[in-house]
Amino acid sequence: MANESGNIGVFGDLFTAVGDLAQQAVDMAGSALKTATDTVQPVTNACVQLCTTSINSATQLVEGATKAITTAIAPKQ
C-alpha cells in the first residue's frame, strides 16, 4: 500500500511535467504568432502605400497624356 502512494506521486509529477511542457509549447506558439503579426503589419502597410502611390502616379500620367493629346489635336485659334 505504501508503494501505491509513491506511484501516485511519480505519476502526478509526470503529468505536471507534461502539462508544463504543453503550456510552454502553447506560449511559444502564441509568441511566435504575435511576432509574425508584428512583423507582417509594417510590411503590409508599406505595400499598401506603395500601391496607392503607384496608382496615383499612373493616374497623373494618364491625365497628363490625355491633356497633351487633347491640346495637340484641338483646332488652333
Curated annotation (Swiss-Prot):
Keyword Transmembrane appears in the UniProt entry: no
Subcellular location: Chlorosome, Chlorosome envelope
Gene Ontology terms: biological process: photosynthesis
This protein's UniProt keywords: Bacteriochlorophyll, Chlorophyll, Chlorosome, Chromophore, Photosynthesis
KW Ribosomal protein (keyword) present: no
Major localization listed first in the record, in broad terms: other
GO CC annotations, alphabetized: chlorosome envelope
GO terms, molecular function: bacteriochlorophyll binding
Family: Belongs to the CsmB/CsmF family.
Record-given protein name: Chlorosome envelope protein F
Organism: Chlorobaculum tepidum (strain ATCC 49652 / DSM 12025 / NBRC 103806 / TLS)
Species lineage: Bacteria, Pseudomonadati, Chlorobiota, Chlorobiia, Chlorobiales
